[in-house]
């Protein structure tokens, strides 16, 4: 969900979260993120998979978290775990590809397989930081 908040609304998002947390509350933010700094999402992914999404870089989020009064206590970068997850999703998809083709067509199947394989490579080879988990 956080990938659809967008940079323009980060400050509001974190300030609102800070106001809603109990004094001893903990927030866990789970998001796909970038390891190569701020940049727009891939145009193909924007058009075909996640319209309106944005994968943030740490450098974009940390200042907004700090300004909101939240304190970051831990950051986990789980890119290799997510690469494995994507490989498993792709395998499961390929096991049922004929069913998917009957339901959605060959073009969809090729697109989805390409998406899963390219994202797996991106997470495995550090294009994406993937699954940034912030505890605040």
Regions found by a protein language model. Give the residues of each.
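Substrate-binding/catalytic lobe of Class I Rossmann-like enzymes that use SAM or dcSAM, i.e.
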Residues: 32-136
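Structured DNA-binding interfaces in DNA transaction proteins
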Residues: 7, 18, 31
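A short glycine-rich, Lys/Arg-flanked "PGG" loop and its adjoining helix->strand segment in the class I
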Residues: 11-26
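Serine-hydrolase catalytic core recognition
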Residues: 10-13, 29-31, 37
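A short SAM/SAH-binding and catalytic strip from SAM-dependent methyltransferases
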Residues: 1-9
């Amino acid at each position: 969900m956080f990938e659809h908040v967008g940079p323009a609304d980060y400050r509001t998002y974190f300030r609102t979260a800070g106001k809603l947390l109990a004094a001893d509350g903990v927030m866990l933010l789970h998001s796909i993120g970038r390891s190569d700094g701020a940049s727009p999402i891939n145009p193909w992914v924007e058009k075909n998979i996640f319209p309106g999404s944005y994968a943030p870089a740490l450098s974009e989020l940390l200042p907004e978290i700090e300004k909101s009064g939240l304190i970051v206590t831990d950051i986990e970068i789980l890119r290799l775990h997510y690469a494995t997850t994507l490989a498993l999703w792709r395998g499961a998809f390929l096991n049922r590809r004929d069913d998917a083709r009957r339901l959605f067509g060959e073009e969809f199947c090729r697109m989805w397989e390409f998406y899963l394989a390219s994202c797996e490579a991106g997470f495995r080879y550090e294009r994406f930081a993937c699954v940034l988990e912030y505890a605040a």
